[in-house]
Structure formats: structure tokens, C-alpha cells
């Protein structure tokens, strides 16, 4: 994600910048699922409490990095359109996801799919 954002910024590539927000959304979903799975491991004793702090901190940091990358990409897109209402832009993107956004999100979801726990 960082490479995608840096490349989009350095190359002033809005197509690449538009691919950052779908990845940020997926990272949030994956982090929530990983936190849920971790709680299950804590409850059944397969993971210790101390490990949980480091794991949770790692996931929180990943979400923060994703949010920062999203902010850079959104600023690029907003600057290009001569509008600079980042929160309004993100709200509209998240509620009115176009076909390109959904396709990009689906591609990322396939690429970064978590293992199915029911088969283990």
C-alpha cells in the first residue's frame, strides 16, 4: 500500500491513487476479522494475553498506515479536481462505489483473502 501511494504521488498518477481507497477499506475489514479471530484464540487458550498486545498494536498500526496512504491519495484526487473537501469525498466514495472501485476492491479481496478457519 505504501509503495502504491508513493508511486502514485511521485508519478502524479490519479489512476493509481484511485486504487488506494479500496485497499484501505479492505485492510480495515481484514484487521477487524483478524482481531475477532485473535479474541477467539485468547478465549480458547491457544494464545496468551501478552501476545495480544503486540498483535493488536500491529493491526492498529497497519490501519493507521492505510489511513495515511488514503489521505495522500484523496488529496491528490481532490487537488486535481480543484475541490478540497476530503471528508466529503471519502463519504461519497464509500457510499457510491462505482464499478471501478468495486472491481479494484474485489481484486484486492481475492489477492489478500484470509484462510478459511472452518476447513482447519
Q: Where are the regions a protein language model picked out?
A:
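Cytosolic, long alpha-helical scaffolding segments
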Residues: 1-120
Amino acid at each position: 500500500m505504501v509503495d502504491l501511494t508513493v508511486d502514485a504521488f511521485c508519478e502524479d498518477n490519479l489512476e493509481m491513487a484511485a486504487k488506494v481507497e479500496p485497499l484501505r477499506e479492505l485492510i480495515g475489514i481484514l484487521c477487524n476479522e483478524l482481531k475477532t479471530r485473535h479474541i477467539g484464540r485468547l478465549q480458547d487458550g491457544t494464545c496468551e494475553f501478552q501476545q495480544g498486545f503486540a498483535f493488536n498494536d500491529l493491526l492498529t498500526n497497519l490501519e493507521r498506515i492505510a489511513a495515511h496512504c488514503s489521505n495522500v491519495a484523496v488529496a491528490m484526487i481532490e487537488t486535481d479536481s480543484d475541490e478540497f473537501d476530503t471528508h466529503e469525498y471519502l463519504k461519497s466514495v464509500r457510499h457510491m462505489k462505482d464499478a471501478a472501485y468495486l472491481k479494484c476492491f474485489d481484486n484486492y479481496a481475492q489477492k489478500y483473502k484470509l484462510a478459511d478457519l472452518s476447513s482447519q
